[in-house]
UniProtKB/Swiss-Prot annotation:
InterPro entries (alphabetical): Yip1/4-like, Yip1_dom
GO BP terms: endoplasmic reticulum to Golgi vesicle-mediated transport; vesicle fusion with Golgi apparatus
Keyword Endoplasmic reticulum carried by entry: yes
Pfam (any one): Yip1
Main location: endoplasmic reticulum
Recorded topology in the membrane: Multi-pass membrane protein
Residue intervals passing through the bilayer: 126-146, 148-168, 173-193, 197-217, 236-256
Domain of life: Eukaryota
Cell location: Endoplasmic reticulum membrane; Golgi apparatus, cis-Golgi network membrane; Golgi apparatus, trans-Golgi network membrane
Protein name per Swiss-Prot or TrEMBL: Protein YIPF7
A GO cellular component entry from the record: cis-Golgi network
UniProt KW keywords: Endoplasmic reticulum, Golgi apparatus, Membrane, Transmembrane, Transmembrane helix
Amino acid sequence: MSNLAQFDSDFYQSNFTIDNQEQSGNDSNAYGNLYGSRKQQAGEQPQPASFVPSEMLMSSGYAGQFFQPASNSDYYSQSPYIDSFDEEPPLLEELGIHFDHIWQKTLTVLNPMKPVDGSIMNETDLTGPILFCVALGATLLLAGKVQFGYVYGMSAIGCLVIHALLNLMSSSGVSYGCVASVLGYCLLPMVILSGCAMFFSLQGIFGIMSSLVIIGWCSLSASKIFIAALHMEGQQLLVAYPCAILYGLFALLTIF
């Protein structure tokens, strides 16, 4: 038993005493007081304000409503996009549609005895010819004749043939758009004839004579414009002959 007691005393031997325990307790209390004082000082210090740019501080205060942002008139007045938008041409002018030019060419066709200014065909205009082709098909439809396909088909083939003939006959070449523009504008008298077919039949002496007059009117106007635009003096009859054949086909559609 004495050996066992000696073993226990040797096994549990330590340098720890009651004085050391009291000293460690005092150290922990001092550390707690120091931590609490630092926490209290940190709580008493004011929090740093959020960062605000100098531009926002210098700008004027907002006076509008929440969902209605204040407009900056200086930005819109100095914006280059507003000025460029105001300087843009109208939409019809960008598309190449000029009603004064259309009216001038229409008057030239309606008065074949008037001298023709060749410069009117320097600008290729297809707005008037398309309108007259649609008007011819519409008047034939109102007269009980559905001939839209024939009108468009003969117009395209006739323009190709006369374009080839004029390039062979003239020293200066001519564009396909110019030929289509002239032939389309000169289709206006044929539209008048098809409009008359809506009210009375043209299958008679009066209808045949009226058709001959309209064919001569269309071919004379077209040949005069081609001669003036291409400087083909002395060749008007040679140009008027294929034009008369083309407009004769349109007259046959109108009568029958």
